[in-house]
């Protein structure tokens, strides 16, 4: 065994988020949501994700924040559960970046309408308000956001979290609902000025509404000029994978080569993509060990492993070997970046020998190990 005289930098520069289901955590471990037992189990998951170098977390605003409405219709917000969640993840080393969950949703892929989320709201008589979910550009939703967003930003500022917060608007907008998305973005700009927006999208029609683009690599490949132009304007470009892309593109499905989830993060380095997002840490249905092809959207199944990359164990999550490979790739990214500080051309040559393009990369373990050995040799010489 040869031990290298190299230390990973303490700063984690690559933004990594695997969205996780708190409901599944509670269900699989037999605890009630928001009970003390739940918080203990969630802490185990948070530390686990941090160990695997995740440093951003989707924060479910309308599960964590509740509201009270006075007789005049004015809302006050209770952030105590939100604070406990963020503080726990912060202490665990997971946050990092706070991803505010989506403010709106769509009922159909190509609908023109986006509808706004609302929190659980208590009325003066102690009953819960029965919200009617309305379109994002309606006067009712505007009135809600005019109260909610300033209160949220004020609270983030008071807690010292303002600069680490980014806001999702609606997941994967397409041309059909771009107008509604842009209207929602305009309200976020108005009521939460300076808050960066982020979403998984490849839709040109929402340009100007997105600060952090998160497209699939295949879409960047087909629209390189567009995404380069957005970066020149100061916007960030991350990448995400889900049930797509397939074919020659890297992904982290069970039946893909184990180098594939690792090399995703060599691709991060090669093209300067600042982050990586995946929707499915633990969104399995039924037996996580047997049901690996989640039936969604019906009647089609998701590719094997898309819905979850960890498994529920008796005392906490069990990593898959794909998750181990992903963590190794994130560490490789930091090593490449470390070498690039002193020998940029050398780091790029090593990376290019492994990932030649988004669809041309080595799956030969021997070739990969030799390239990584060259990386470690160069780092030892440089430091």
Show where each model-derived region lies.
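Catalytic domains of carbohydrate-active enzymes that cleave complex glycans
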Residues: 120, 126-181, 185-202, 273, ...
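Short, hydrophobic/amphipathic alpha-helical patches that form generic packing surfaces
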Residues: 48-51, 81, 263-271, 331-339
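Weak global preference for isoleucine
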Residues: 6, 16, 25, 65, ...
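Hydrophobic alpha-helical scaffolding
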Residues: 75, 174, 251-254, 258, ...
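Aromatic-lined carbohydrate-binding surfaces of glycoside hydrolases
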Residues: 1-191, 195, 199-211, 245, ...
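Catalytic-core region of carbohydrate-active enzymes that cleave or remodel glycosidic bonds
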Residues: 88-89, 212-302
